[in-house]
């Protein structure tokens, strides 16, 4: 019979640090279709966070869906970077989180912009990406 009637998920945690939650799930269905679902896309907050936050280890345009667990910046802080780099799909979360995310990302952008300026670095994303 082989694997043709099997459903399986490959889970790739794309971080080794405590913050920066970002888990890519590749779901393979019995009919052969594949969906890529990203669970969270958070900011790293470790000492070398500016460097850690600059890149995503996957192509955002290849992600089918994003699911956000809650609005803490270490779970949502790189969503604007995801959008800036090509993600155009929907972001799924609870109603309460969807309201709070807007405020969290606006505040986060101000902090990121200021820290980038102090470090003489380019900001990760622009205000329009928020």
Feature locations, PLM:
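A short, charged/proline- and glycine-enriched loop
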Residues: 4-6, 61-62
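Extreme N-terminal starter segment of soluble prokaryotic enzymes
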Residues: 5-10, 36
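N-terminal glutamine amidotransferase
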Residues: 2, 26-29
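Short beta-strand scaffold segments in enzyme catalytic cores
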Residues: 20-26
